[in-house]
Each structure stands twice: as structure tokens, then as C-alpha cells.
A protein has these predicted regions:
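Active-site environment of divalent metal-dependent phosphoester hydrolases
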Residues: 91-95, 117-119, 154-155, 178-180, ...
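Metal-dependent catalytic neighborhoods of phosphoester/phosphodiester hydrolases
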Residues: 96-105, 119-121, 253-260
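Active-site metal-binding motif and surrounding structural segment of the metallo-beta-lactamase
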Residues: 65-111
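Conserved beta-strand hairpin/beta-sheet module of binuclear metal-dependent hydrolase folds
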Residues: 10-75, 158-173, 191
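Cap/insert and terminal regions of metallo-dependent hydrolase folds
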Residues: 180-277
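C-terminal regulatory/interaction regions
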Residues: 2-23, 256-288
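Active-site neighborhood of phospho(di)ester-bond hydrolases with catalytic His/Asp-centered motifs
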Residues: 59-62, 82-90, 110-113, 170-173, ...
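Metallo-beta-lactamase
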Residues: 22, 113-166
Length: 288
């Protein structure tokens, strides 16, 4: 199980990672098991596109509906390609566009009941609601999706693993600590989207009020670069071929600091490291 024709590096100016071109468009009849594109990642909006070729979903929709549609189109995609939206938790940077996309394109929204109660005053009526239970695998066509609990200051936040034909993607952002459950679910992934929110020194010495710094550092806050490095040290395995660092703070982190710190846990000959950013889409990564 390995990524194919994937560029190393995010294309971010000043970030010292090798780059290679990525020009092949999305294929409806794929030669891969899963494809992923992070449309946006950060405190101003999060959305991730995942597709098996026959089934395509959004995990969170934290930008406006118009902006998500624009970013999909920049990759040769459309909301009309989507089969569903998954919601990890109710914070605005994860749900801003959920309601309008669901209504406009008749998309079901998969969400747990506690998150639904907290989110729906903001997102309004949707096309269809599909409640999932945390810890129970469910199917969207050929995608097997497993939501698992994470520690964050929301009603019932979750991470996800997505499996198709033996290939697994893991998504874990917006978590203050790494629990045994998180490790268990992420240790079998071929591609991992992992939070690296802040550099600890930048956070402590930065402009945030002390109360906000404490919240970010808390057990229900966000993972630091160092915490992400420690997690990868503990869960590395032969199948893990690609890590994408996500939800970087634009105030308390830089892509280069995240790469330099987290990269210490990875063998660059075996695992590709990329960074997702706020202002532009990632490449469309394919995994066989």
C-alpha cells in the first residue's frame, strides 16, 4: 500500500522539502484505492475530500459553500461528485458550509447525535441526517468509516479512519492529548492526516492571552509539533507511507517548524511528509 505520483512538499515558499510535479487529473475509473485532497486546514476553516473513485465524501465543511465549491473546481471536482458530508465536531471552522452544501446538492450529513444537537442551530435544516455511533463502523457505499473519540472542547468530537479494499486513511485533528484509543486506531494507516497545531515556544511567547494559551495547551486543546512527533515515534509501522500535518496555527507555528520537528520521527526514505495549509488546497494524493 503506497502513495503513487504524489509530490513531496506542500509548495509553500520557504519550506525546505523536495517537490515533484503533480498534474494528472482526478480519474473516475481509478488505479488507486483511495484519493485525498485537503481543501483547507486551520482555524479559519477545514475541509477534506476523500474518494474511492466510486464514492466521494467531504470530511467537515468549515469554509463557505461557495469557497468549498471553488476549491473543488480548482481540482477538477464538483460538489455534484459528492455522496455525503461527515462532521467531526461542531466548531464553526468545521461546519460553516455544511448546511448550504447539503441543501444545495442534496447531500446527507453523517454526524453523531451530541454533535448534531450542538451544530444544527448554526447549520440549519439539511437534506438528510445520518447519525453514527462513536466506535461503530458504518458504510457509505464502498467506504468503511470508523469514528473514534478524541479529546477536544466540543460535545462529542471524533477522528476517523476510512478503509477501502484494505487501504486505510486516518484523520486526527483538534485533539489535546493522544489517548491509547487514538494510538490504536492510527497505527494501521497507510496515510495519516495528523494535527501539528503549534510550536510550544511560539505559543508561550506569542500574542495570545494567557487563558487562550492554556486552552490550546490543555487536554482538550490542540496537539503541538512535539506531541505529534511523539505519537509518530510510537505508532510507526511498515504500512505508513505518508503523513500530512494539519491544523497548523498561523500565529503559533510555521510549516517549516512543523516539518523540522515532526520529521525527526520519520525516515524520509520510507514515509513522505507534507503540510496542509489554510489558504490553498493540497495536491490530490492517491494511495494504492
Amino acid at each position: 500500500m503506497k502513495p503513487t505520483e504524489i509530490p513531496v512538499g506542500s509548495g509553500i515558499p520557504g519550506v525546505n522539502m523536495k517537490k515533484s510535479p503533480f498534474s494528472e487529473p482526478y480519474q473516475a475509473a481509478p488505479d488507486y484505492n483511495l484519493a485525498v485532497c485537503i481543501l483547507a486546514s486551520g482555524s479559519r476553516g477545514n475541509a477534506t475530500f476523500v474518494s474511492s473513485g466510486s464514492t466521494s465524501i467531504l470530511i467537515d465543511a468549515g469554509l463557505s459553500g461557495i469557497e468549498i465549491e471553488r476549491r473543488l473546481k480548482s481540482k477538477g471536482l464538483s460538489p455534484k461528485d459528492l455522496d455525503a458530508i461527515l462532521v467531526s465536531h461542531e466548531h464553526t471552522d468545521h461546519i460553516q458550509g455544511v448546511g448550504v452544501l447539503s441543501r444545495r446538492f442534496n447531500l446527507p450529513v453523517y454526524i453523531n447525535s451530541k454533535t448534531q444537537g450542538a451544530a444544527f442551530p448554526q447549520i440549519g435544516k439539511v437534506h438528510d441526517v445520518k447519525n453514527f455511533a462513536c466506535g461503530s463502523t458504518f458504510l457509505i457505499n464502498d467506504l468503511a468509516i470508523h469514528p473514534f473519540s478524541i479529546s477536544h472542547d466540543a460535545e462529542d468530537p471524533v477522528g476517523f479512519t476510512l478503509n477501502q479494499n484494505g487501504t486505510t486513511i486516518g484523520i486526527a485533528t483538534d485533539l489535546g492529548i493522544v489517548t491509547a484509543m487514538v494510538k490504536e486506531h492510527l497505527k494501521r494507516c497507510d496515510l495519516l492526516i495528523l494535527e501539528a497545531n503549534h510550536d510550544e515556544d511560539m505559543l508561550i511567547n506569542g500574542p495570545y492571552p494567557w487563558s487562550v494559551k492554556q486552552r490550546v495547551k490543555s487536554r482538550t486543546g490542540h496537539l503541538s509539533n512535539a506531541a505529534s512527533k511523539q505519537l509518530l515515534n510510537e505508532i510507526q509501522h511498515d504500512r505508513l507511507k505518508h503523513v500530512i500535518l494539519a491544523h497548523l496555527s498561523e500565529t503559533n507555528n510555521t510549516p517549516q517548524k512543523a516539518v523540522d520537528e515532526v520529521g525527526k520521527a520519520l525516515n524520509p526514505n520510507n514515509v513522505q511528509l507534507d503540510v496542509a495549509v489554510q489558504h490553498e488546497c493540497s495536491a490530490l494524493f492517491r494511495i494504492k
